Regions:
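Positively charged, low-complexity intrinsically disordered regions
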Residues: 56-57, 114, 183-185
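Short beta-strand-to-loop capping motifs
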Residues: 18, 126, 183-187
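Catalytic core of non-heme Fe(II) oxygenases with the double-stranded beta-helix
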Residues: 94-162
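Catalytic core of Fe(II)/2-oxoglutarate
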Residues: 136-203
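Generic structural signal for short, solvent-exposed loop/turn connectors between secondary structure elements
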Residues: 1, 72-73, 77, 87-98, ...
Length: 203
């Protein structure tokens, strides 16, 4: 099975080497958010959708930054985030919930799944230094009964990584505390983003 590292591209991902970002700047940005901003995933989701169903597999080891608890601003409102967003040519502007900081405690893992809400994500790993465990893509259409592993990809820590959410994927148990800034959208398909990349019109 193929394992991709560094600057790479394959069927379900592409490292966007046209974008360079300052990981230390994002680390400092993340570190300003105190414990009151670190909400368990299920609690975070209800801030924006009170009827959001409880997901048992998304334990309290998986938290998201609820930025308004710090000073009333959403993540998307901060200049450091806007500077990143401006580097991409999305089909439509991102919304408030399309910018996320994800924080995972050691021992958390993602079972095989698809992203129900979005088509693509652009991942900026903040911690640990090596970017953490790889993303694994799986064959099949039923995430409850996936087929064979297709390949694994380690997120680049130099350039953001574009991934599709519509292919079954998982992440093995995390050994270290992990933090990722994620831009996501349901209004730009993976193929549209790749086509724009190929024409030099996405970044």
């Amino acid at each position: 099975m193929k394992i991709y590292t560094g600057t790479s591209s394959a069927e379900h991902h592409r490292v966007l080497d046209g974008v360079v970002w300052d990981r230390n700047e994002l680390l400092e940005f993340y570190q300003q958010f105190d414990e009151s901003c670190h909400l368990p995933w299920n609690e975070f989701k209800k801030k924006y959708n009170p009827n959001n169903p409880y997901r048992r597999t998304l334990t309290d080891k998986f938290r998201q930054i609820y930025a308004p608890n710090l000073e009333g601003r959403e993540l998307i409102d901060y200049p450091v985030v806007q500077n990143l967003i401006r580097q991409f040519n999305f089909d439509e502007p991102l919304g408030v919930t399309d910018v996320q900081i994800l924080a995972y405690e050691p021992g958390f893992s993602f079972v095989p799944h698809i992203d129900a809400e979005v088509d693509i994500s652009i991942m900026f790993p903040i911690a640990p230094d090596d970017g953490g465990e790889p993303l694994t893509f799986w064959e099949g259409d039923d995430f409850r009964n996936p087929g064979e592993m297709i390949y694994k990809v380690h997120y680049s820590t130099e350039h953001p990584t574009l991934v599709t959410g519509k292919t079954i994927h998982s992440v093995e148990e995390m050994k270290d505390y992990r933090v990722i800034l994620r831009l996501r959208t349901a209004k730009t398909s993976f193929q549209s983003a790749i086509d724009k990349c190929n024409s030099g019109n996405f970044v």
